Amino acid sequence: MSRKYLLSLLLVGALVISVVASGCIGGSQTPTSSPTKTQQVQELEIYHWWTAGGEKEAFDALAKKFEKKYPNIKIKANPVSGGGGVNLKMVLQSLMLAGKPPDTFQVHAGYEMARYIKANQLTPIDDIWTEDMKKNYPKVIQQMVIFNNHYYAVPINVHRANVIWYNKQIFKKYGIDPSSIKTIDDLFAVAEKLKENGVTPFALGDRNKWPATQVFEVMLVAVGGVDYYEKFINGEISANDPTLKKVLEYFVKYVEYSNPDHAAKTWDEACALVYKGEAAMTLMGDWANGYFKAKGWKPNVDYGAIPIPAGVYDLVIDTFVLPAKAAHPNAAKKWLSFIGTVEAQNTFNPIKGSIPPRKDAPADPYDPIQKSFIKELSSSETKLIPSIAHGSAVPEAFLADLNDIISELATSKDVNKAATEIINAMKKDLLPNKIKEWHLS
């Protein structure tokens, strides 16, 4: 056994021990109504990665609402820190191999689910998907949780990855009109102006790699358009493609306008730079909205949001699934049915910063930024794309390669090398593992 493999096993073991030792977190401590004597209290073990500001509060509110509805079920939440589930995936792998999965766990819609389905580690939940749900969930979102003609997950939210979050005080100070930013070139023109005035234009925190890949995917659609994005996730480009090299050059440009210590920071630490006025903007998903609100900032007063590029909605969808060997499948099914309701989604999403996937959810509880996103998502003119960085659009093995390539590019700035490595990774890990043909136009 290699030393590197041994260290990996020890890390996974330590993560499992830490989350198991954490006990019951995130549910309501005392049910509103007590179970009757004939009812036996059931435990519902849930694993998720919502630990940052806004995220934890959103899950706690959701858990409290569920326990009020089902007082004979007690939630045992095991949050595993690490944005995008970077650490949770390792913990789940260990639990699955041991044959002791949680009752349900968080996973992104799309390809990220495929590893569990291929290994027969998830149970189809067609019975959970009522006609009401099918009617009120957008078709593209339903397709992201259907494999082999079966539903495998229930989406709780819709996040948007392609958003620039900016400090309104800084923009006002330097006379920057946010409505002037429509394209990636507009964005870099603003970045240059800020840099000339001694302000760090972008806050980046790519210690966990995925935030850098997320910047890359936004550059991909901003530079190449939706048609080119589709070709990329279908593995239909070459190393000599001038558009790919331009995308990589724009990524390097973004990094050069960012804080020098980006590789040491997490996504929420990057958001903190914007909050503190140490950077003007950050390119991040709308979970940043929940972060800023948790800090006491008011949307469209202290900070604003600019979709980039305009007219595109980069989908990041959080779901929950039913493991095949769940200890409490009936309790898990109640949870899955619950999170598919308007009640649950309008409890969770206003706090989280995301929006509800259900089209019939009233927009009243949402802030102005979320309301504008709800309107865009429902517009026939908005182009919907699945996120690469968050495991929806491409096979997991290829995403792991891409994370490493983009992370290295952030330091090396070697565009030609990165382009060659991306195409090689497509041949090795995207095309052989391809199970979906995306049609985005």
UniProtKB/Swiss-Prot annotation:
N-acetylcysteine: modified positions: C24
Keywords: Acetylation, Cell membrane, Lipoprotein, Membrane, Signal, Transport
Keyword RNA-binding: no
One Pfam family it belongs to: SBP_bac_1
Primary site of residence: membrane
SUPFAM superfamilies given in the database record: Periplasmic binding protein-like II
InterPro entries in alphabetical order: Bact_solute-bd_prot1, SBP
The UniProt record lists the keyword Aminoacyl-tRNA synthetase: no
Topology class, membrane: Lipid-anchor
Lineage: superkingdom: Archaea
Compartment(s): Cell membrane
Signal peptide: 1-23
Lipidation (S-archaeol cysteine): C24
Cellular component, GO annotation: plasma membrane
Role description: Probably part of a binding-protein-dependent transport system PH1214/15/16.
Family: Belongs to the bacterial solute-binding protein 1 family.
Protein name stated in the entry: Uncharacterized ABC transporter extracellular-binding protein PH1214
